Amino acid sequence: MSKPTAFPLDESRLPFEIPRDEPYREKIARLGQMITDRIPAKKGILTKDDPEYWGLASIVTDEMADVALKMKVRKPMTLPELVKATGKPAGELEPLLQQMAVVGLLEYNWENPRREKQYILPMFVPGSAEFFNMNKQQIADHPEVTAFFERMTFLPLEHITAMVPPGGAGIGMHVIPVEKAIETENRSADIEHISHWLKKYDGKYAAGPCSCRMSRAAMGEGCGDDPDDWCIGVGDMADYLVETNKGHYVTYDEVMQILQKAEDNGFVHQITNIDGENKIFAICNCNVNVCNALRTSQLFNTPNMSRSAYVARVKPENCVACGRCVEYCPAGAVKLGQKLCTKDGPITYPKQELPDAVKWGPDKWAIDYRDRNRINCYDTGTAPCKTACPAHIAVQGYLKMAAQGRYRDALALIKKENPFPAVCGRVCNRRCEDACTRGTVDQAVAIDAVKKFIAEQDLNAAHRYVPDVVQPSLQGPWPQKIAIIGGGPAGLSCAYFLAVQGYKPTVFEKNERPGGMLRYGIPSFKLEKNVIDAEIDILRELGVDIRCGVEVGKDVTLAELRRQGYRAFYIAIGCQGGRRAGVPGEDAAGIETAVHLLRTVGGDESRKMTGKTVVIGGGNVAIDAARVSLRCGSDGVTMVCLEPRDKMPASPEEIAEAEEEGTKITCGYGPKEFLSENGHVTAVVLKKCTGLYNAEGRFAPTYDENDTIALPCDNVVLSIGQCIEWGDLLNGEAVQLGRGQGAVADALTYQTAQPDIFVGGDVCTGPRFAIDAIAAGKQGAISIHRFVQPNTSLTIGRNRRDFHELDKSNLALGEYDRAPRQSAALDAGIDAHRSFRDAHLTLTEDQVKIETARCLGCGASVVDPNKCIGCGVCTTKCEFDAIRLHRDLPECSKMVRSEDKFKAILPYMAKREIKIRFAKKEK
């Protein structure tokens, strides 16, 4: 009986087999045919290949089928009525009915004047397909019921969703908005408020597991949520859930806590929509990545299947393109665009095509809707600052908050993406400023300086911001143990983001103090140690266990940690070794790597260096080494680099500061050999660099061996690259190493060939900046959360964090603030040229007001009303009153009984057909 479908179930991808080897059971086939809404199945004979057959056959006995076949779908029957219909005595029948209810084939209520218990044979969806999947043991014993549920939310609908009118025609579930989002809407109807339904069923609530979350996980496509208690049965359904061991009673206050936690996580409230406007039996809190009900609108691109009466609208004048609404919108209806006009006027953004007046079929569907709905911005681009930042921090947002004096809110917004704003406010390489549109006018906004001002709160324990834990679970902290190897920016970032998801990770750090290269690779005159300590203390407040002086691979192995119960590992040990030049004489005393020098001085600032120092290298680390050498007492420092002056990798600001302190720079040369006397270096012989890259664009310097100069010196610091020192860490592991001995990992998930090992930071990418490591740490945390939760996909519905910069050459800026860029002063009490103390002060509050006013406000969110389902999740994430719900579609609140669905569908279908024909004639 199975008919071809445009989206067949790929059984090869299921972690179980659907059994078909048992003898054919005619009663099961008849029962499936009686219950199903699938028209082809109603007209023919079910086979073993039909999901209605194998779904029921897995758990329904022939004795149960005999009873069910005496019933009619959704027609309540009392025990005496069933005794009469089946001929079975009550003493034998009642336990059987109870067992049928426990497995989920029957439900019951007391909706009659005498409040007599009635048994009901429900439809499949919403009904028995869900009930089958509300028992973990039943799923474990009969996993095929999960695929049955999935098929029953697809096959009966694939040919009719385009014909479903606003309101949903009594099919399935329906979105009900976040109550706070419509409180001020005086035209709202009672049935549009969750409070209406809670009042209607006052005191009759039960929380049960989410059948979608459990079934999808069993199919290998879990979302990482704990499934328990997200679904709330109301009225008689609450009693049914409790009496059949599918749920437990909850109070009104507990219901409100569940709803609030759902909103915190960005879940969508839905109510059942098969009984008209006077009855529901459940309120669900749905994750679009697994929800079979939301799938009916998202996969088929037919929003009428889900949408409420409300549509979100953005107030561009308030919007700052922070992207929070975009990240949480379940329908992908909100994307980042631009607020600034082009030279040709405002951009017109495309809208999703709707099935109202066009033929609709698989070519119009979005099979990959879970990924497609996570697209962040339109192709025309958005704010360059957010795009350029590796962590994609909401720069425009926190600048606006700072302008409004909302400094704590600004800090909280930054920490959505970066747990170390005080650190980054001092040492970030500021790609946001390089991209800033204001830089095309005069100078970029001093974004980092404003961030530093905001983050000063973190340096005072009384005022620091510790984020709330937002966990997709109602059962308390996650029990899974996670080990993070390496306490640098990537590892600590991963720990932070795991902690705010409800984990208690353990960080293993081989050094005496955590911080990695932040502590041991960046001099204190740029980043004071107390700044690092203050922000790391916040991780401890979140429950992160940081164990220093432990070298994994030496003091304890990964295998031993597994035996201790650790379920996943994030390796982020950085590039802690320095590369040598590979030229004669480099073993002489007095020659060391920059990594070694900076680590040594980072732990002991009393180190002394005498005589002249030559630093080989042209990057920021070489600059740091030169400046440290001067502070350690060197008589003079010369930097030597291969690159010409205008191609030096170090930032212009760093170069200027080094030269101001007395460092000399020689460009276009590399080391040929080191000269020594009595084993100690006395000079470096340099040779002229004639080219840096080969024909393929790879770094492959060439030299003129005859064009040489000699620089006398007493110390040489090599800053020509860093390397990874794995030690015995990976012994016995399947992790593969690639170029530069970096760990090979998936570009999106950071998972290695050893499934429970993830990597991040420099061990994966090679030496980069702190903000790159911080961004990688968050992605590692996302992957690890998904990995340790049962049967969860690492990729489905994952935000790829792809952003596009708007076209800065095609803007009509109009009026803007003309103030010049602000700069922080230096502390006159500190010798900025020779002290190890940081002499840089922060901007004053007045300067912050001036600087934030310089922001041009490039970006804004844009809502596609054709995709919006009116859930209101976006409004809960916006802190700028920039997005609100409006009751634009009151017809979407029309609730009808399932039995009357064709009374709603047929008139709409006829009107739609006329529109389609008329549209064809117009063409």
PLM regions and their residue ranges:
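Ferredoxin-like iron-sulfur electron-transfer modules
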Residues: 58, 88, 119, 270-283, ...
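A short, conserved structural fragment
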Residues: 101-112, 334-335, 883
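Short, amphipathic alpha-helical interaction segments positioned at domain boundaries
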Residues: 115-154
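Flanking helices and flexible, charged tails adjoining ferredoxin-like Fe-S electron-transfer domains
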Residues: 331-384, 399, 445-447, 451-481, ...
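Beta1-alpha1 glycine-rich phosphate/pyrophosphate-binding loop at the start
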Residues: 393-396, 402-403, 444-448, 484-552, ...
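Glycine-rich dinucleotide-binding loop and its adjacent helix/turn
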Residues: 454-475, 534-554, 578-632, 737-753
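FAD-site-proximal beta/loop scaffold in flavoenzymes
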Residues: 587-610, 694-767
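A conserved FAD-binding loop/helix module that cradles the flavin
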Residues: 763-788
